[in-house]
From Swiss-Prot:
Glycans are attached at residues 23-24, 38, 54, 181, 301, 499. The gene is HA. It comes from Influenza A virus (strain A/Duck/Alberta/78/1976 H3N8). Major glycoprotein, comprises over 80% of the envelope proteins present in virus particle. The extent of infection into host organism is determined by HA. Influenza viruses bud from the apical surface of polarized epithelial cells (e.g. bronchial epithelial cells) into lumen of lungs and are therefore usually pneumotropic. The reason is that HA is cleaved by tryptase clara which is restricted to lungs. However, HAs of H5 and H7 pantropic avian viruses subtypes can be cleaved by furin and subtilisin-type enzymes, allowing the virus to grow in other organs than lungs. This is Hemagglutinin. Residues 1-16 form the signal peptide.
Amino acid sequence: MKTIIVLSYFFCLALSQDYSESNNSTATLCLGHHAVPNGTIVKTITDDQIEVTNATELVQSSSTGKICNNPHRILDGRDCTLIDALLGDPHCDVFQDETWDLYVERSSAFSNCYPYDVPDYDSLRSLVASSGTLEFITEGFTWTGVTQNGGSNACKRGPASGFFSRLNWLTKSGSTYPVLNVTMPNNDNFDKLYVWGVHHPSTNQEQTNLYVQASGRVTVSTRRSQQTIIPNIGSRPWVRGQSGRISIYWTIVKPGDVLVINSNGNLIAPRGYFKMRTGKSSIMRSDAPIDTCISECITPNGSIPNDMPFQNVNKITYGACPKYVKQGTLKLATGMRNVPEKQTRGLFGAIAGFIENGWEGMIDGWYGFRHQNSEGTGQAADLKSTQAAIDQINGKLNRVIEKTNEKFHQIEKEFSEVEGRIQDLEKYVEDTKIDLWSDNAELLVALENQHTIDLTDSEMNKLFEKTRRQLRENAEVMGNGCFKIYHKCDNACIESIRNGTYDHDIYRDEALNNRFQIKGVELKSGYKDWILWISFAISCFLLCVVLLGFIMWACQRGNIRCNICI
């Protein structure tokens, strides 16, 4: 009995040895791509959620919290609005003749002079802000028969009563206020901004005390425009001890044109003009501190980097800024489709190619080879296909930034309550633009992601086809991204396949011979190793059963006698 069992064991071992020797005459070569345990989800045209090995965030969602003073010239308005600095409010004298790229208005800014209003406040503010300068040139206006340099206790300049430094308050001289008619030509080659005003007394008595006439009139004209203002006498809410008001107006005089001022009372006259410039200067309301740093893009929240194509920090920007979108995140695929590697590969340690899964741990390339031959297993990257994919993906982010970054500023849109309908329309237009840009951004990123994934898949297929053309009938496609090579292929042979120097003819006869020796039907299942072992065990078991049956039959015939002793 023991002899039979030992013989069965050696017979099965021989079968196993034959199987191993058969494997030594073949090799397996698989092609695969890089994979990571946890990829990044991106959106493409065809799939809202597809996992890739690597992706770059495209939306800047936070600011530095401070405004950088380089490369843009930042002028901190502190407690002065731009209009107060323009008019020459006593507490804003420090801003005379200042220049800026961006004037930062603070929420703590206040007026500290005679109360005024500007009927076209936003236009004047925007005009001066874009000019980028408060450069003022005094001119020699002749005001005959009136008292100049009027002041008010509401506008202290030091201990004495004062007034806006860029304006001249004209009142009666004695008991008369003659009709004033003054002209001032523009003989220069640039536009001149004249700021003037009309005083609205709180009572009729104040009107006659200051200007004699019961009702004044101010007319300012050029060849292109004319404005006539009649004072509106009446009491208003008290501000800094005054219930009267001054309305501020402005006139632009082109080169070769003439400014004409005509008035019989209530005129707040200009002292000169502001030199207008064209440029990209602007104004922004912000309470962010100004710091010494470098940033091309500024928002009211603070400076932000402009190395991303989109941002959702603030709609108001200045400089070369990412485009504002509603989305909090948009990810650009900068890697290939991610298929995490399966950890269990069977009893024989089988390898699989890109059709089944990706390969983790490929640190030197995106695409590569794994092999299994008589010398063991190995892995190497294919640098050529890796570089081809990287070259096409590199620069993708920069191209998106170039398409979307604004090289100009988005100014604030403000309107008075009277212009509420215009404000609503402007808000609707701005919201629509943001919606369109947000949708366009999402579509652009989805298109780029689709292109990246298709590109990386294509490079994998190119490498597979290149390998198949080299091997020809010397190997068989296994269907999982691998080739079964029907000849002995050591590491040098594998290397020749990888670098493209493999000579098909050298191994042709051996491969054809091995094809005939190997069984025609080959198991293709992923559980081939298990099935082979199970079949092997069953065969050995059946052999033992047959031998035992033969022994029992022989015993019954008397050919073999079995004695059992107790």
